[in-house]
Amino acid sequence: ATQGLNNATQLNEAKLAAVSAEYNQYISNGDIQFESKNYDKAIEYYTKAAALETGYTYPTEMINRISTILQENRLEQLVSNSIQISSNQTKRFTFNPIDVTTRKNNYILIKAKNLSENSYTMFISYGSAKGNSGSLIIRIPNNQDVNDYIIRIGAQYKWFSEDNTWIELTPENGNIEIELMEITKGN
């Protein structure tokens, strides 16, 4: 019985060491991305670290810190009062062209809630009077929580090379409530 207990203890310690190493790797990668101002990538690593449920609050604190940085560096507020967008409907938000010197470091910050009972994709398109400059897709999870989406739009060539004046959101196969949408920049 003692041998079995010792084996179980060793196995448990090995599992804890593996989780600890994985957590430390995610935190290290998140911190590197944070220092490089790649906030979207930093959040991915911090989210993975938080999902390990180690009891540490650091990953959540860093995600909140990034969200605060982005909100403090807001360039354009596109949604401040909640709006709903029905499935497969498109809603366009207009703004003045962003200063060319800050475009490469731009993010779109969206706080949104899934109003449907399934996960789905949402298309984010952007452009100007000349037409559509580009688009990307984000996954909307199957939960009814308000989720933060931080999209590094400045990494897209047509975002920083064109004078874009609108962003469109199109939820595909699900309804969504947008509580906040801003164009922001890393500090």
Placement of each model-derived feature along the sequence:
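Alpha-helical tetratricopeptide repeat
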Residues: 19-34
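Short carbohydrate-recognition loop motifs
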Residues: 76-91
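Extracellular ligand-binding interfaces
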Residues: 87-156, 174, 182-185
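Short beta-strand-plus-loop segments that form exposed binding edges in beta-rich domains
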Residues: 167-174
